[in-house]
Amino acid sequence: IAAIAVAANQVDVDTGKLALTKARSGEVKKFAQTMVTDHSGAIKAASDLVTKLKVTPQENDTSTALVKGGQDARAKLAKLDGAAFDKAYVDNEVAYHDTVVKALDDTLIPNAQNGELKSLLTSVRGVAAAHLEHARQLQKSLK
């Protein structure tokens, strides 16, 4: 579960950094900076917790698929510029955060056996849901 949490957050940090260099809209850049900041914080919180618990996150099919999906999305986004990039980036963020919230609700939180990990995932879920709503609002403004 920890490997999935770190991978999911790293994907959004990397995509956000790309958006900071390519986005045209000030609102999209602001959103991208929020993604980099918030998801970097989530990675640190997860890393601190696994250190405290003396566990090593194990890569698995889900974490590997998240990383691959993130790489594929960034490759597609990197080919776009301006308004086309902004729209594609925000569309990607809506889909990505929707998937993350569902994974947290359906798999990660219910299967977390450690109370501290479950608490961290619940906190991350709240942030991911807020990001999803923010991305949806941006999506509406870009149409």
Regions found by a protein language model. Give the residues of each.
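His/Met- and acidic-residue-enriched segments that coordinate or traffic transition-metal cofactors
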Residues: 1-143
